[in-house]
């Protein structure tokens, strides 16, 4: 299935000179991984508390900007690990765990908006965790780590960024709170349905590859 993840090689080529510079400065893959997680969690808390007491503002657009920067962080830590011989068992743990922590925080912060259904957002977090676990499980049966779409990590970053943009621009279009609820929860439901398909694809392709 198509996924934004397939654009990763081209993205890495753009970042390669920057990665070489980081290596010369003594920056390690694990440093980048942990820093990205800390910024993600800090931003999630900031959005959650900031928008509890006021309506949407331009500040919400920090979210899609960070999601793009975070994709660069994820590419950089992987390139440092692979191309500069920094791969380690600790790095493998940090890569998976920090991503899951960051994803969960960055999705849950949308609970602060009253028009978003909490139960639906919690379900998305669960399905996102399950999809990553389905990918991580593949090596246990002799297959490669699976990154199949259509709702991988990069895809979720895009759709949640779109959610943030919708939340920002909607008040300029309409003041119908019921409609914004339908739009945002409909988008979240769409993400959930594609997450279920992603889980299925990762399990199916892991088993088929192993056979």
What are these regions (language model features)?
Residues 1-65, 105-144, 148-211:
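Hydrophobic alpha-helical transmembrane segments
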Residues 72-80, 93, 97-101, 130-133, ...:
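Active-site His/Glu-centered metal-binding helix of metallohydrolases
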Residues 79-119:
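Basic, amphipathic juxtamembrane/active-site segments
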Residues 57-92:
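Glycine-rich active-site/cofactor-binding loop and its immediate structural neighborhood
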């Amino acid at each position: 299935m198509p996924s934004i993840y397939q654009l990763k090689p081209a993205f890495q080529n753009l970042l390669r000179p920057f990665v070489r510079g980081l290596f010369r400065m003594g920056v390690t893959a694990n440093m980048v991984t942990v820093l990205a997680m800390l910024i993600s969690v800090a931003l999630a808390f900031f959005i959650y508390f900031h928008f509890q007491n006021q309506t949407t503002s331009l500040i919400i657009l920090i979210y899609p900007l960070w999601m793009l920067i975070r994709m660069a962080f994820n590419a950089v830590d992987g390139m440092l690990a692979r191309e500069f011989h920094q791969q380690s068992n600790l790095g493998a743990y940090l890569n998976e765990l920090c991503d899951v922590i960051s994803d969960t925080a960055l999705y849950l912060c949308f609970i602060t908006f009253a028009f978003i259904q909490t139960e639906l957002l919690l379900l998305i977090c669960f399905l996102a965790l399950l999809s990553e676990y389905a990918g991580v499980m593949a090596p246990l049966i002799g297959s490669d780590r699976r990154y199949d779409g259509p709702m991988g990590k990069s895809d979720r970053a895009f759709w949640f960024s779109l959610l943030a943009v919708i939340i920002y621009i909607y008040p300029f279009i309409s003041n119908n709170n019921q409609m914004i609820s339908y739009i945002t929860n409909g988008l979240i439901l769409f993400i959930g349905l594609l997450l279920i398909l992603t889980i299925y694809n990762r399990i199916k392709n892991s088993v088929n590859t192993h056979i």
